[in-house]
C-alpha cells in the first residue's frame, strides 16, 4: 500500500481546521479480491460530453466532503479518470441500496435499544445482533455519501446516540456496544458537518465524557482520544474542560481529573500491562495543558498543571517509566519538559532559577517582598489579618471559606482583560475587570445611586400622574364613543320610524279614500234615483239621518303598528279586501298539504342481526315543521356499503384485528387581606367598631386620597378618575350607618381628636344622599363593563340558533345517522322518520363487533370523509356553538334584570337630586342626565337583541322537534357541542390508528429488506473498512496517540533546555534542572 504523503510536522497537516501549503497526493490502491477502491475496468456506459461530466463529477465530489486542496486535485484529473471514478462510486451506491442505506433505519434501531429497560441480561445472539447494528452504523457514517450523513444529522441522529449513551444499563456500558457507539461519534466527527454538529450540541461532549466511568478499556481509550482531539479544534478546549467538570459531578469525584490519575496509577489486574490506556491518558493531559489558552498563557498552564500535581501525577509518571514504551515515554518527556520550561520562566519573574511551590514560607516571602513598597501592601496585610480571623473548626464547613477564597484568586489570575475565562468559571458572573472598575469608582457610584433614587421617586410620581390622566382620558373617550354610537343608532331608528310613519300615513289615507268611495256607492245604491254606480258623486252631507258611514279610522298606534280594521259594512255591500298577513307570519309553501302525509319507507334489511343504535325516535305527530320533513334517508342506502356496515357491527361476529382507515373558566378572584392591624394614638377619639375602623383605615391607605379629595370626587361624579371601580366597591362597604352618624354627631365638636376612620365617616355623612350617590357612581362605572359581558352571551344564542337552523352539513349528517339507525334497528326502534338530537351523543355507545376500539361514531366519520366530504365543514358552520352552550338563560335574565333595576335606581336618584337646591361643585345632575340618556338607549338595544335571540332560539328548537319551553340554551347547544367534541376526538383517534398501521408496515418492510441483505451487507462493510482511508479526525487521533502532535514543541523544549543548561554552567548559581517530584 502506498503511504500517504505528509506535508510537514506538527498538527498542521492533519486537520482541515489547520491548513498547509502542500498539495495532497492522491493514490489509487488496488486489492487482490474483487472489492477495491477504484476499479480499473472500463465503464459500461459511454462517457458523456466534458461539460456534462464536470457537472456530474462536481456533485460526486460534494458528496465526498473533501477539503479544498483535495477538491482541486480531484478536478485536475483527466476526463477518463473522472468518468471511471464516477461510475465506480455510482455502482457502489446502487449495490448499497436497501434498508441499511436509510438513516431512518438506524435511528429506529437506536431508539428501540435505548427504550428497552430490562433487568435480564441480553442473550448472546441478541447482544451480537445489536453490536452488529451499531457497527454497521459506524461503517455507514464513514463510507456512505455526504447526503447520508446530512440526513442522519437532520433526523437528530446524534441525539439518539447520546440518549442511548445516557440511558444504557451497566451490562451494556461494559459491552462492545458502548465502544461501537463512541466509534459512531468518532466517525461522525470525521465529517466536517458532523464535527460541527457534535461541537455545537449542548450536551455531546459532556455525555462523551460520562463514558469514562466504564471499566471497558477500549471504550476509555476511544473517549480520551476524542476529547484530546477536540482540544485541538478551535473552541473545543474549553468544552473539554467543562466536560471534565461535568464528569466530576457525574462520578462524584472529590476534584476534577481524579479518575484519570487513578486509572493512570493502576497497575493491577487488567491495568497491569495496559499501556494503550496510560498512553491515551498522558496524550489527553498534554493536549489539555498545551492547547487552548495554554498555547499563549503561562499562568493558565501553571494553574491547570497544579491541579494534576495536587493529585500526585509526578510520582505516577516516575512509575510509568518502567514500562519502557517509546510512545508512552514520548508523552512523559513532553509533560516534564514543558513543566520545567514553564517553572523556569515563572521563576524569572522573581529573578530566581526555581521556586519551591511546596514551601509555604518561600512563597509567602516572595509575595511579601514583591508588595512591601507598593500601594497594595496595606491590602496584603489586611488579607493576612482577616485570614487569621477566619473561623476554623475541624468538623465544620470552614474549608468552604478557603475554597471560595481559592477560587476567587484563581479566577483573578486566569481571567483575561476582556473578562473571559479560559477555564470553566467556578464563580458565575464574576468579572474581575468590572469589579475593579466598581471599586475604583465606589464614591462616584454612591453619588449616582442617590441621584438615581431621587430620579426614581420623581419618575414614580410622574408615572402616577400620567396613569391618572390616561384613565381620565380613556373614560372620556369611552363616554364619547358610547354617545356617538347611541346618537347614530338613535338617528337610524328615527329615520326608520319616520319612513314607517310616512308609509302608514299613506296607507291610512288610501284606506280612508277607499272607505269614502265605498260609503258613497252604498248610499247612492240605497237612494232611488241616485247616481248610478261609477258616476261621480258629490260630497256627503255631514248630518244624514241613519247614515251608514262608518266612523273614521283611528290614528296609527305608536311603534308603527297598524290600526285595527274598520267595522264590517252593512249587508249588501261589497266585501272588504283581505287584509295583509300579520307581520312576521310565515306563509305556507305553495301546494303544501294541510296535514303531513308520511309515505312508507323502503329500508333494506340486513341478512344477520346487528347491534342496535340506542336512539330516541321522534313521534310522527311532531314531525310537521321540523328539519325531518326535509330529510330523505333512503338516498343514503344507495351510497353506503351495507355489507361493510353489517360486517363491522354484526351482533355475533368474532373479534379480530381491525383498522378503520379514517381521521379521527373559572375566574380567580382577589381577596382583600383583612388581617392587618394598626394602633391608634393614645389621644385619638374613636366611636366606630374597632374591626370596622381598622378595615376602613386599610382602604383609605390604599386610596391615597384625602377626605376632601374623596368628597370632591363623589360630588363631581369622579370626572378626574380618582376612584377606581374596585375602590368604589370597597367604599360601599363603609357607608356610615345611622348609629354611626348619631355617635359621630354627638362628638362633632371634637373633630380634631377624631381617628382617621371616624373623621372620614363623619365627613362622608355630611354629603346629601351619600350612599345613593356612591351607588349611582359605581353603577355608572360598571355599566359599560356589564353590558359588554351580556352582549356576547346574547349574540352567542342568536348566532348559534341561526347556525343550527341553516347548516347544510348538519342536515346531511342527520340524514346519514337516520339511515344508520333505520338499517341497524328493528321493530319499534326502527322505521323512524326522525330522532331526538340528544341521540347524537349515543352514537359512540355502539361498539364494533370485531374491534372494541371502533365505535359507530368512528365508522360514521369514515363514511362521511369518503362519501360526504361537504359534511367535514360542520365545525366551521357551527363555530359559535361552544360559546352558546355556556349561556345559562336564567342567569342571563338575572343579569338583565339587575341592569334594569340599577338603571331605575339611578333615574330615581336623578329625580331626587333635581328637586334639591344645587350645591357648589355638585355635578351629579348634569353627568347622570347625560349618562341616563346613553345608558337607556344601550340597555334598550340589549333588550331588543335578547328578544330577537329568544325568538330565533325558539324557532331552532322547534326545527329539531323539541319543545321550546322545556329545553334551555345551555342544554340544547350543549348537545351539539358535546357531539362536535366527540367527532373531533374520533377523527384524531382514526388518524392515530392509521399512522400506527403505516408505521408497523414500514418497520416490517425495513426489517424484511434488512434480513434479505444482511449477508451482502457484511461483505460490503468488510470491503469498505479495508478500502477506505481514515478520515481527518482519525488522523488527528492517530497523531495524538503516537505523540507526533507534540514533536515540534518537544524539539523546541529540548533545544531550550540545552541552551539553559549551558547558561547555568557558566553561572555562579549551580542548580541542576531535574524532574520535580510533587
Swiss-Prot record:
Coiled coil region boundaries: 437-526
SUPFAM superfamilies linked: ARM repeat, Formin homology 2 domain (FH2 domain)
Matching SMART domains: Drf_FH3, Drf_GBD, FH2
Region (Disordered): 456-480, 524-585, 987-1034, 1055-1078
Keyword Cytoplasm in annotation: yes
GO cellular component, one term: cytosol
Keyword entries, A-Z: Actin-binding, Cell projection, Coiled coil, Cytoplasm, Cytoskeleton, Phosphoprotein, Wnt signaling pathway
Region (Actin-binding): 693-702
Location of the FH2 domain: 600-1009
Domain comment as written in the entry: The C-terminal DAD domain may participate in intramolecular interactions with the N-terminus.
Protein name: Disheveled-associated activator of morphogenesis 1
